[in-house]
Swiss-Prot record:
Signal peptide: none annotated. Glycans are attached at N1. Residues 1-21 are annotated as: Disordered. The keyword Signal does not apply. The lineage of its organism: Eukaryota, Metazoa, Chordata, Craniata, Vertebrata. This is Nephritogenoside. Can induce glomerulonephritis. It comes from the Eukaryota. Keywords: Glycoprotein, Repeat. Transmembrane segments: none annotated. Sequence repeats lie at residues 5-7, 8-10, 11-13, 14-16, 17-19.
Amino acid sequence: NPLFGIAGEDGPTGPSGIVGQ
C-alpha cells in the first residue's frame, strides 16, 4: 500500500511500503 511507501513486505492491506507492516 502506497500509504506505507513504494515497495516492501506485505501489509494488512496488501503490499505495504518501506515500513512493511
